[in-house]
Each structure stands twice: as structure tokens, then as C-alpha cells.
Amino acid sequence: MLEKQVKKIYLALGSNLGNKKVNIEYAKFLLQQNKKFKILKTSNFYKTKSWPNYKNPFFLNIVIEGLTTLKPLDLFKFIKQIEVKLGRKKSSKNSSRECDIDILDYDQKTFKIKNNNDFIHIPHPRLHQRNFVLLPLFEIAKNWIYPNKNKKITDLLINIETNDLRTIKLI
């Protein structure tokens, strides 16, 4: 990777269908097969209830810190290919899935990118409300700042409701 083009990124990976841990490990493997992507750190696994439908199977989640020379839209397309390769199908929002990958942060910048008839928002617009993202992210990036709100991750964690924190378990 060329030094000046390298961007630090954070991705959230989750699965609530099939062998969840294997799905996530395989997604990590596929990420690293791209010469324009390198994983630096990986959080532990966190088990959380499915949201908003708690009747769906539980999720396993991790966050990874990486480096990439891919542009934001190319990174988005790359991770969507991985999701499809792992069995993800076009379905309703918040449905169960073998693999879900979200871009949490791309070089501490915010993006709204048109993709077909939709927009991609980076960082993920609800990142600050999600315990299953904030806790693993805090584990590997204690000084991370949320670019949308210019807030430290510790400030975001303080605002998570206690009941939400009780629904997540370190594996």
C-alpha cells in the first residue's frame, strides 16, 4: 500500500445466522485477501440480542481496525460482495443475516455518497446508539472520536442506557 493513500478505518462485523463465529472469521479472511486492505486490530466477540426484533437469533459482533487504499465507495462495494459471498440476501431492514459489515469510520471523515438510488452514510448514522458497536470499538480504540458529533467514544458510552448495556456480553 502506498503510504500517502492509506486510510485508517473501523468496520463492524456481525452475524446471527448459521455458525456465527465462523461467518465472522471467514469475512475477516476475505477482507485480508484484498491487497488494498489490512487488519490491524480485532476486538473480542460480543453477544447481543437481535434488534429491534428480540425474537430473532442473537448476534455475535466484533469491530476491526484496518488500513485501506480503497476509496469509500469501493470499500462499501467490497464489503457488500463479502456479505453476499457469505449468503446475505436482499431482505428487509434489520432482518437476520449470515454476515453484516458496516463502515464505522473512514479516516475520521464524514461522507454521504450516492450509490444507485440510495445514499451511503459514513460513519454509520446510528453508531452512537449501538452498544454492540461502541463497546468493541472502545476495546480497540479508546481515544476514538466520532466525526459526526466530534465526541469521544467515552462520552458516547456514557449516554448508552443501562438497560442496553445489560443486553451485551463479552464472549
Predicted regions and their residues:
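Flexible, gly/pro- and Lys/Arg-enriched active-site loops
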Residues: 50-59, 70-77, 81-171
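Extreme N-terminal starter segment of soluble prokaryotic enzymes
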Residues: 5-10
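Juxtacatalytic helix/coil linker segments
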Residues: 1-2
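Residues at alpha-helix caps and immediate loop-helix transition turns in enzyme cores, especially N-
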Residues: 23-24, 145
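A structural signal for short, well-ordered beta-strand segments
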Residues: 13, 42, 62-64, 101-105
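Short N-terminal binding/cap micro-motifs at the start of the first secondary-structure element
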Residues: 19-21
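Short, surface-exposed acidic-centric catalytic microdomains
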Residues: 26-72
